[in-house]
């Protein structure tokens, strides 16, 4: 492999800077256990397992076998309020100030989406029809939460492994809806709008266009080609509706984005057919991650447009349906963000994104397993 000099790269969507420093790829890290430690006692008390429905608050949503009673065994996916919520439903939202400081009632929703009754089967190892049920469950809750016009933003996210923040090993995701738009999203929204109003269209659609149809060249001063960059080399997997790739300015070696090929600003705009293709893509990507890296901890989240029921088509959000493009980000925790990253907001990635994409793309998985409903 040719030597790769450290590079500063800027992500055009978030605006953040990343240092790609392949020479640091062998920096020692504390080893992660491949299987989370769990005592038999803790396992026997898991509140998410079938038969322990009385250990959680009453279910909000479920996909279950016909004829089964609510809050009883027989469910396939189950959503319950978080027992220790970050937000709650209150009669009114009380905004107030204390000097220079602002406060507001923590109005919102905090839910747990339990992926299956099976304590030990990760999402990527579930049958395809079960992964499709999981994706449909997220969609149903997202749609329902946006009916509350006080809620401006819905975030669906998953923590896998203790190092990624999971407190329980039973596979699950979480859903939080808030009255504020997070700053991370605001930055993306504003950059997307700037790109759009400058006549360059949707920035995600443009990225996909470059990945599939363009070769970028860097020239020497004498006009000869120094290097030709094929953006498609960062693709991990694709199917009819979605593409998964390592970003140009990835924060971690295995930061993976999954983006719909059709322009949609919100996850709730997806059709049943598109959600099935998303289930296939999630299965493929996470199976590759599992096989290549040995069940590493990871976080993933769906970045969707703010609640379209309440966002006015004016001001900063006047073009949101045209300029924003919903997507999934997966952060595989193979490195640690230490003092420099935390203090500067600049991330050091010890692996060239093209190499990371190649390693994942070349990781073979059984296509029959991906498509199997058994």
Identify the function of each model-found stretch.
Residues 1-374:
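HIT superfamily nucleotide-processing domains
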